[in-house]
């Protein structure tokens, strides 16, 4: 739970004396933060590990926990840089489902930087392809899949 509470401290702002005296506003804010943390731990499938340190979780679980840590702050946009790096196929599929849920059910825009094209094509509405720092193409997954420049650069001449 502490893993998710740490992300919410900036939003709570109960004040020093309010916290020391355990004022009603402090208790209410603390309760809401705990509820949000528990909700997100359940959503990512880690509620049974609520009191474990992040470093003691499996690598895929650590990745999901990082995303939940962001989501407790209720962001409008979430930037994920190579979230599938180092994950096995099962963990990548779970990540794909989690990202789709965030986008579809939590009104969160996802900015995804990723090399796993199966993941990118499966969850993206729009894709921007960059080749060695230069923009190459942008469009829907279907447009990118059929783009001759993308195919030439990434698949080679057929």
Language-model features: locations:
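Glycine-rich phosphate-binding loops of nucleotide-dependent enzymes
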Residues: 1-158
């Amino acid at each position: 739970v502490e893993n998710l509470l740490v992300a919410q401290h900036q939003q709570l702002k109960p004040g020093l004396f309010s916290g020391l005296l355990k004022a009603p506003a402090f208790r209410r804010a603390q309760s809401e933060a705990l509820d949000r943390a528990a909700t997100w731990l359940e959503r990512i499938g880690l509620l049974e590990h609520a009191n474990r340190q992040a470093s003691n979780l499996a690598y895929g679980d650590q990745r999901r926990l990082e995303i939940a840590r962001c989501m407790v702050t209720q962001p409008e946009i979430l930037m994920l840089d190579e979230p599938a790096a180092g994950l096995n196929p099962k963990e990548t599929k779970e990540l794909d489902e989690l990202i789709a849920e965030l986008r579809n059910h939590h009104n969160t825009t996802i900015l995804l930087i990723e090399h796993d094209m199966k993941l990118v094509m499966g969850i993206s509405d729009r894709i921007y392809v960059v080749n060695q720092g230069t923009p190459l193409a942008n469009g829907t997954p279907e447009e990118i899949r059929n783009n001759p420049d993308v195919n030439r650069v990434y698949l080679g001449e057929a």
